[in-house]
Structure formats: structure tokens, C-alpha cells
Amino acid sequence: MPPDELVRRWSTGDGVARARDVLERLAKGTALDGLGLATVDGLVDLRGLPAGGLDAHGGEVVGADLSHAWFAHAHLTGVRWRRCRFDRANLSAAVLVGGGLTECTMRRADLREAVVAGGIWSSVHLAGITSNHLSADHTTFTGTTFPALRHVEFTACAFVDCRFTGRLAEVRFLGRGQPAPMLLRDVTFASSDFRYAEFDGMDFDNVEFPDDGALIVVPRSFKAVAERAGMISLRRRDDVGKQLRRFLSEHSLRPGLSATAGWAVSRRDLAPDVAELAASTLHEAQQQLRAEGVIP
């Protein structure tokens, strides 16, 4: 059924009353049983549902197809979604607080300016999402696959067994100043195409980056490594050395950085001479600190 028809069917005939019933139950967090809803591929057929601006609290939705549904500006608090499809759904400017998604897909969904806070996303596939100005706060992602991302901010989020498959442009992983270190564990970055990606205060535990020389990575103890690299760089008293020391200070000396946090930057984000000096001094600093037993 074409997308326009999926949407239109909720505004004609019996679809009007059916949409009202579905939205009322979603808002109250009650089950959708007994509404006579059809199924598609074994999932409750909610494709094209007009749920823009929905204010929903609690409840669990299991096994629903919400492809092409409209959740723009919705506020979903404590709602748990399991085995649901949100493929090509519009969740722009939606706010998802608490709750979470498990074994769901959001292929080519629109998540522009959406806010995710305090939930758990497990085994979620986000291939092809539109992510401009998406923000996530205190959210745990496990087994989740991320596509290329642009203008995304993750604050105090944890990532376990996740995979980032594409370019990261102005994507920020912010963990500084949290009571416990924020974690990237068993995470793979398949692409080194980073442009102003920022890792600030995130602990790296078995994190894989492409080994193609495009990135400068300090897998642990960046604060100590940056301090030692700054001392090593004093051999260079020229503008390149000064630029590097300034850059390292800006990234390592702000309050709240844990002693164990890792760090990474794209060489393209630095002037070529500064990038070359950064790579060599940070490498030498790590070697010295390992030899001294300061870092593992």
C-alpha cells in the first residue's frame, strides 16, 4: 500500500474511530487488544498512524508496525516498545523520556531535533535515519546499529556492543563531569570519516577504530597522556608546537575529565603540521607512561 494511502485510511470511514481508539490507549498506556486491528507480517498494523503531538505515558507496545507513522512533536514518557517497526516514521522534534526500544527498527526514520532521555535502546537498527540535531541524554544503547550521523549530541550516554557504520559529522560524545565514567564498551566504528567528532570524557573499553591513519586515538588516560605530550612538544617552540599545546590544554584541562577517559580526533580537524606533531607526541607519551607503569 502506498504511503499516502497508509496515512489516508485513518481519516476516512471506520479509520477515524479506530485512530481515535488507538491514540487514546497509547496516551493512557493501555494495551491495544480488542480493537480489531489487522496484522501485517505478524505485526499489528499501525502503519501511517497520525500520532503527531501525542502525549503518552507508560505502557508497553509489542509487535506493531508503525512504518510511515507520524509522531512529530509527540511526548512519549515511560513507553516501552518491543519488536516494533518505525521504518520511515516521522519522529521529528519528538521527546522520548524513559522507557525504551527493544528489537525495533527505525530505518530511514526522521529523528531531526528529537530528544531521547533516560531510556534503554536495545537491538535497535537505525539505518538511514535523518539525525540533524538529535540529542540523547543519560540513555543506554546496547546492540544498536548507527548509520552516518550529523549534528548529534550524546550526553552522559553509555554504549555497549554497538556499531557505527558511517560518517560522523559534528557528533559529540560527552561524558565529562558525571558521577561515574561514561562508557563505550565493545563498540566498533567502521568508518574513519570523522569531521569535528568529539569524544569528551568517555571511557573506551574494547573500542575499535579503523587502522588507516585518519584518526589519532588515545584509548585510555587521555588526561595524563595529554599532559606528557605537552611536555614532549616543548622541543618545538614554533607556532606548530604552541598550537598543539593550546589544543591539548583545551581538551584535557577543563574540569570534570575522568583519569581513565579515552579520546580521539580526526587528523582532518587539525592543520597538517599540528596533526603530525600531535600523532607523534601522543604516541611517544603513551610509550613513556606505559614504561613507567602509569598507564596499562
Annotate the PLM regions.
Residues 4-12, 16-236:
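Tandem repeat scaffolds
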Residues 1-39, 222-296:
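N-terminal capping/linker segments that flank leucine-rich repeat
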